[in-house]
Amino acid sequence: MSKLGVLLTICLLLFPLTALPLDGDQPADQAAERMQAEQHPLFDQKRRCCKFPCPDSCRYLCCG
């Protein structure tokens, strides 16, 4: 049984569970969030930033 524990420990050290991509990290999800920010009423299309006050729902920089 201890050999199995050692093998499991070695496998987890070589391939940690944090190396697996999460659903929120997918490029498709990031593009969808970016599109939502561009449709935000405070988003300035020309300057590509959010007008002040910058809400949390806007994913871009604040214009200032």
UniProtKB/Swiss-Prot annotation:
Keyword terms, alphabetized: Amidation, Cleavage on pair of basic residues, Disulfide bond, Secreted, Signal, Toxin
Tissues expressed in: Expressed by the venom duct. Is present in all duct parts with a highest content in part 2 (proximal of the venom bulb) and then decreases in concentration toward the end of the duct.
Disulfide bonds: 49-58, 50-62, 54-63
Domain of life: Eukaryota
Domain topic, free-text comment: The cysteine framework is III (CC-C-C-CC).
An example Gene Ontology CC term for this record: extracellular region
Protein family membership: Belongs to the conotoxin M superfamily.
Entry-annotated residues carrying Cysteine amide: 63
Positions annotated as propeptide: 20-47
Name this protein carries in UniProt: Conotoxin Tx3.5-a
Pfam families with a match to the protein in the record: Conotoxin
Taxonomic lineage of the native organism: Eukaryota, Metazoa, Spiralia, Lophotrochozoa, Mollusca
Post-translational modification: Contains 3 disulfide bonds.
Localization of this protein: Secreted
Source species: Conus textile
GO molecular function: ion channel inhibitor activity; toxin activity
Secretion signal span: 1-19
